[in-house]
A protein has these predicted regions:
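Short, strongly hydrophobic alpha-helical membrane anchors
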Residues: 1-13, 284-289
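N-terminal signal-anchor transmembrane alpha helix
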Residues: 15-41
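Functional transmembrane core segments of multi-pass inner-membrane proteins
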Residues: 20, 133-241, 284-289
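Alpha-helical membrane-inserting segments
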Residues: 31, 35, 120, 124, ...
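C-terminal ends of transmembrane helices
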Residues: 32-37, 96-104, 144-154, 197-209, ...
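Membrane-proximal soluble regions of multi-pass membrane proteins
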Residues: 37-109
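Select subsegments of transmembrane alpha-helices in polytopic membrane proteins
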Residues: 107-115, 159
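Interfacial loop-to-transmembrane junctions
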Residues: 213-217, 247-273
Length: 289
């Protein structure tokens, strides 16, 4: 069956782009679940580990929660979301952004994540075409969206996302899917050490922690996928965009100077751009030197 589908998509690229976009919309719906539930699951695990370490009695068993069960419910009235109410974007528009049971407003985040994931998936398919690169670039893209969403909401980049991506990037380099093994391994080490070094120097000078350890791991992930040569592009792009947005928010009084701003989404965006357009960005930056 696959041997028939691939030639069809190669001959009908827009059918392929449309198919991947629809898959992206569906995955976006699942990413909303990941963004919401994974931090809760981690918090429960940490609390349980702390109680065990302190030799304290375990807390009362909570309802089982993972990425699959229980089915999504309205946080206000407990109404279980039906399949028809869970169609990406369409259900939100049909319900006019409200719960069908209690009319509580549904957060705009949900359709936005679905739409954004669909758009990103389309761009990846359009850029790489019918290839293994598309498959793995989609996995990275979707994971970066989930990680960014969690970082924005909780200032946390879960190891459950970053570490599997790190090893997957290195594994793919054995087969030269994006880069070779040498570039991947050096990229991972250099990515981690570069931000770790900045963190240490900043802490020595100011006595404060300027960024989280998850940022080191995320840059290591990106280095493993795009190679050490594009780390400069990722760091420069993420820093410029992050500084611009941060300064703008301060000027507009949307935040204060002491407010922590998650850096993960900027790293993720710069890394994603580097995966697709790294060489072009490299040439653009070095044209100013």
């Amino acid at each position: 069956m696959i041997s028939q589908i691939i030639p069809f998509f190669e001959q009908s690229p827009w059918a392929f782009y449309s198919y991947i976009t629809i898959i992206g919309l569906l995955v976006g719906s699942f990413l909303n679940v990941v963004i919401y539930r994974l931090p809760i699951m981690m918090q429960r695990e940490w609390r349980g580990d702390c109680l065990e370490f302190l030799k304290q009695p375990a807390e009362k068993a909570e309802d089982k929660l993972n990425l699959w069960l229980p089915r999504s419910r309205c946080g206000e009235c407990g109404h279980q979301i039906t399949a028809l109410e869970n169609i990406p974007i369409i259900s939100y528009l049909f319900l006019r952004g409200k719960c069908s049971s209690c009319n509580t407003h549904i957060a705009i985040q949900y359709p936005l994540v679905e739409l954004f994931t669909g758009i990103i998936s389309f761009i990846v398919a359009w850029h790489f075409g019918v290839s293994l690169q598309t498959l793995f670039a989609l996995i990275l893209s979707w994971s970066l969206i989930a990680a960014s969403g969690i970082d924005i909401g909780h200032k946390l980049l879960p190891d459950d996302l970053t570490l599997p991506l790190l090893w997957l990037g290195i594994l793919l380099s054995f087969f030269d899917i994006f880069i070779n093994l040498e570039s991947s391994v050096i990229g991972a080490m250099a990515g981690y050490m570069s931000l770790w070094s900045v963190y240490i120097v900043f802490k020595i000078i100011t006595g404060k922690e300027g960024m989280g350890h998850g940022d080191f791991k995320l840059l290591a992930v990106l280095g493993a996928w795009v190679g050490w040569k594009l780390l400069f592009v990722i760091i420069l792009t993420s820093s410029l965009v992050g500084a611009t947005i941060g300064i703008t928010m301060i000027l507009l009084k949307k935040t204060s100077r002491g407010t922590q701003i998650p850096f993960g989404p900027y790293l993720a965006a710069a890394g994603w751009l580097s995966l697709l357009y790294g060489e072009q960005l490299n040439r653009f930056y070095f044209s100013f030197l």
